[in-house]
């Protein structure tokens, strides 16, 4: 397959991944519970470009917009030694799987250290790992309490993390909701009623006593 065909094929896969990302992740926040602790996670439109691994001159906002609207062109992406075709192909496949990971059994990894940076958390299904950090503005001030996906690793990252925990609960809600309204995953040995009060206070009444 030639380079042009590679780009055309990847662009089609990016469009599919963007559609899944838009339908299942953007505009929502997710609450992951593990060991009685929790973190809140956002999957932002602005992070989509980086997660694909492709090289492009488009801004993060334009890249996602074009992909979601199925307007992205093969001429707008390229591959480099830092953005190889084979890795991009695997990463784009994983983006589509993040939606499933956000509602299924998985592990929470703490303190993931890679060759280039450190991530506070990551969640994995043993095949890939979205790596999470808090978001900061240009002045170094923290932007909100939620974690965002900064990187998508094509590995489980267990060996790169300090500690691994089993995720026991995953909840979601629209960004504008005051409390979490949907239970996406519940470990077979866990209950909602058994959660610490701090977490239960974050849940809509319809989710309590499950």
Predicted feature residues:
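An acidic, glycine-rich, mixed-charge low-complexity segment common to nucleic-acid enzymes
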Residues: 1-117, 122, 172-210
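Compact beta-sheet-dominated globular domain cores
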Residues: 125, 129-190
